[in-house]
Amino acid sequence: MDCCTENACSKPDDDILDIPLDDPGANAAAAKIQASFRGHMARKKIKSGERGRKGPGPGGPGGAGVARGGAGGGPSGD
């Protein structure tokens, strides 16, 4: 007895809730949920050692090149 062949798993269209998209409370709740999830994913990436960078890293086009080690083109203090 497979529930998917008997259509017991699928919901009819009548059971789907119609949520108004212009509700300020719903928009605020959705924004809070999204911010929470994005923070969770950012902390997860940091914990696993990944960097969430978009675009080229140091040394790439428009990058800073050698940014550490004191060999940059900044003021030397001499």
UniProtKB/Swiss-Prot annotation:
Residues 48-78 form the Collagen-like domain. One of its GO terms (molecular function) is calmodulin binding. It comes from Homo sapiens. Acts as a 'third messenger' substrate of protein kinase C-mediated molecular cascades during synaptic development and remodeling. Binds to calmodulin in the absence of calcium. Residues 39-78 are annotated as: Disordered. Residues 26-47 form the IQ domain. Belongs to the neurogranin family. Neurogranin is intrinsically unstructured; however, upon binding with CaM, The IQ domain adopts a helical conformation. This is Neurogranin. Keywords: Acetylation, Calmodulin-binding, Citrullination, Methylation, Phosphoprotein. The modification Omega-N-methylarginine is found at residue 68. GO terms for cellular component: axon; cytosol; dendritic spine head; glutamatergic synapse; mitochondrial membrane; neuronal cell body; postsynaptic membrane; trans-Golgi network transport vesicle membrane. SMART domains: IQ. The modification Citrulline is found at residue 68. It comes from the Eukaryota. The record marks 38 as: Crucial for interaction with calmodulin. The modification Phosphoserine is found at residue 36. GO terms for biological process: associative learning; nervous system development; positive regulation of long-term synaptic potentiation; postsynaptic modulation of chemical synaptic transmission; signal transduction; telencephalon development.
